[in-house]
UniProtKB/Swiss-Prot annotation:
It is found in: Cytoplasm. PANTHER family: SULFOTRANSFERASE SULT. Keywords: Cytoplasm, Lipid metabolism, Phosphoprotein, Steroid metabolism, Transferase. Expressed in brain, colon, liver, and small intestine of mice colonized with B.ovatus and L.plantarum. 3'-phosphoadenylyl sulfate binds at residues 44-49, 126, 134, 189, 223-228, 251-255. It comes from Mus musculus (Mouse). This is Sulfotransferase 1A1. Homodimer. InterPro entries: P-loop_NTPase, Sulfotransferase_dom. Its EC number is 2.8.2.1. GO terms for biological process: dopamine catabolic process; steroid metabolic process; sulfation; thyroid hormone metabolic process. Substrate binds at K102, T103, H104. Belongs to the sulfotransferase 1 family. Pfam families: Sulfotransfer_1.
C-alpha cells in the first residue's frame, strides 16, 4: 500500500486532505433528505462525542443498537474518502432514514442540497487553543494528513488557515451566522463538558424528541470520555493502522479543557491571543479556554 500522507489540495481556497478533495465534485450532487440531521464541527471539536450522543438519542438509549457498528459507520462522514475504507457517500447510500450525517466542511464546500432543504444542523465549537493542540497530535496519528512538522510550525499554519479544512476562525463564525437563516443548534464543547445533561436536553428540544429522565442519564454515562475511550465501537480502534496509528497517539487522547497549557509556551500563548483578538473582533459569542 502506498504511503497515505500527501500534501493538502486546495478546493475553492480551502486546503483539504487529498482523498477528500477528490470527492468534492461528486459531493455537489449529493441529495439531502428532509429528515436528515447534520453534525458539523471544525476538526477536534467533539464530533465523535456528538455522533455517539445523537445515535444514542435516535436508538432510545438502547446500548445493543448503538453497538451494532463502529460510530463512523453509524454516522457517515460526508466527505470521507480513503483507500481501503468505504467512502462516506457510499455509506450514506446504505443508511436508512432518518440519517445523521457528519461533516467538517466549511459552508463554501457544503453540498447545496443540505442548505436548500434547510435540514437541522447541530454545530459544536471548541476553543481554538485546545483545538490546535489536539489537531497537531491528530495529524501525527491520522496518516491521511501531511506530516505536521514541528509544533511551532503547525501552530503558525493553524493561525494562517493552512491546515486541513482551512481557518478555524472562519469556520466557527460562518456557522454561527447561519443560525440567522437556517435551523442551527450551536453548542460549545466546554458547555458539554461542564454539564452534559443540560446540553443533551437542548438537543432533544431542538430535535422535537423526548426521552425518559433515566434514559438521558444513561446517555450521559455512556457518552462520557472514559466510557467512549473503552468502547471499540466509539474509539476508532477498528480503523486500519495504516490510516490511524493509535500507538503514536490514541484517537481519543484526553478530551479535557485547558490541556493547551501543557503545550503552548507563554510567548506562544500571547502571540496567539493577539492574533485571535484581531480575527475575532466583533463576534457576538465567546469561548472559554478553561472551566
Amino acid at each position: 500500500m502506498e504511503p497515505l500522507r500527501k500534501p493538502l489540495v486546495p478546493v475553492k481556497g480551502i486546503p483539504l486532505i487529498k482523498y477528500f478533495a477528490e470527492t468534492m465534485e461528486q459531493l455537489q450532487n449529493f441529495t439531502a433528505w428532509p429528515d436528515d440531521v447534520l453534525i458539523s464541527t471544525y476538526p477536534k471539536s467533539g464530533t465523535n462525542w456528538m455522533s455517539e450522543i445523537m445515535d444514542m438519542i435516535y436508538q432510545g438509549g438502547k446500548l445493543d443498537k448503538c453497538g451494532r457498528a463502529p460510530v463512523y459507520a453509524r454516522i457517515p462522514f460526508l466527505e470521507f474518502s480513503c483507500p481501503g475504507v468505504p467512502p462516506g457517500l457510499e455509506t450514506l447510500k446504505e443508511t436508512p432514514a432518518p440519517r445523521i450525517i457528519k461533516t467538517h466542511l466549511p459552508l463554501s464546500l457544503l453540498p447545496q442540497s443540505l442548505l436548500d432543504q434547510k435540514i437541522k444542523v447541530i454545530y459544536v465549537a471548541r476553543n481554538a487553543k485546545d483545538v490546535v493542540v489536539s489537531y497537531y497530535n491528530f495529524y501525527k496519528m491520522a496518516k491521511l494528513h501531511p506530516d505536521p512538522g514541528t509544533w511551532e510550525s503547525f501552530l503558525e499554519n493553524f493561525m494562517d488557515g493552512k491546515v486541513s479544512y482551512g481557518s478555524w476562525y472562519q469556520h466557527v463564525k460562518e456557522w454561527w451566522e447561519l443560525r440567522r437563516t437556517h435551523p442551527v443548534l450551536y453548542l460549545f464543547y466546554e458547555d458539554m463538558k461542564e454539564n452534559p445533561k443540560r446540553e443533551i436536553k437542548k438537543i432533544l428540544e431542538f430535535l422535537g424528541r423526548s426521552l425518559p429522565e433515566e434514559t438521558v442519564d444513561l446517555i450521559v454515562h455512556h457518552t462520557s470520555f472514559k466510557k467512549m475511550k473503552e468502547n471499540p465501537m466509539a474509539n476508532y480502534t477498528t480503523i486500519p493502522t495504516e490510516v490511524m496509528d493509535h500507538t503514536i497517539y490514541p484517537f481519543m487522547r484526553k478530551g479535557t479543557i485547558g490541556d493547551w497549557k501543557n503545550t503552548f509556551t507563554v510567548a506562544q500563548s500571547e502571540h496567539f491571543d493577539a492574533h485571535y483578538a484581531k480575527l475575532m473582533t466583533g463576534c457576538d459569542f465567546t469561548f472559554r479556554c478553561q472551566i
